[in-house]
Amino acid sequence: MKVKLITVGKLKEKYLKDGIAEYIKRLGRFTKFESIELTDEKTPDNASESENKAILDKEGQRILAKVGDRDYVIALAIEGKQFPSEQFAKELEQATLRGYSDITFIIGGSLGLSPKVKKRANQLMSFGLLTFPHQLMRLVLVEQIYRAFMIQQGSPYHK
């Protein structure tokens, strides 16, 4: 199985890069992990609705170009489903049992995700109604993916 994380925007903070690298290293025991950073579109401060839509469409095209036809896609969106960690672990396990060999996670840019990306997703997932910096969400998500694998192994890490 391969896990892929597609994100919009460049991660600059070293402490976040270090944390993500640590969890990717730990995940190496279970899966191949690929992280793909896509260029974000610059959003003017007073962007109109049509400008925002055009930005979402451009970013969405870049995202979808990196998604495989047979990938199981989980996109982060505020309106998505919230999972307890144990259920999230089962969701990943079920995806592989349904024949998906690649699981792709998507974190959009500052405007979120285009409707086309959301439509392509097999599952929309939310970490709640709070707003998080997109860069921090990468670390939180990668840790939760690692936690899911540890839960599947019956490891005490989750306790």
Curated annotation (Swiss-Prot):
S-adenosyl-L-methionine binds at residues 76, 108, 127-132. The keyword Protein biosynthesis does not apply. Keywords: Cytoplasm, Methyltransferase, rRNA processing, S-adenosyl-L-methionine, Transferase. It catalyses: pseudouridine(1915) in 23S rRNA + S-adenosyl-L-methionine = N(3)-methylpseudouridine(1915) in 23S rRNA + S-adenosyl-L-homocysteine + H(+). CDD domains: RlmH-like. GO terms for cellular component: cytoplasm. It holds the Pfam family SPOUT_MTase. The keyword rRNA processing applies. Coiled coil: none annotated. One of its GO terms (molecular function) is rRNA (pseudouridine-N3-)-methyltransferase activity. It is found in: Cytoplasm. It comes from the Bacteria. Homodimer. NCBIfam families: PRK00103.1-3 (NF000985), tRNA_RlmH_YbeA (TIGR00246). Specifically methylates the pseudouridine at position 1915 (m3Psi1915) in 23S rRNA. Belongs to the RNA methyltransferase RlmH family. This is Ribosomal RNA large subunit methyltransferase H. It comes from Streptococcus thermophilus (strain ATCC BAA-491 / LMD-9).
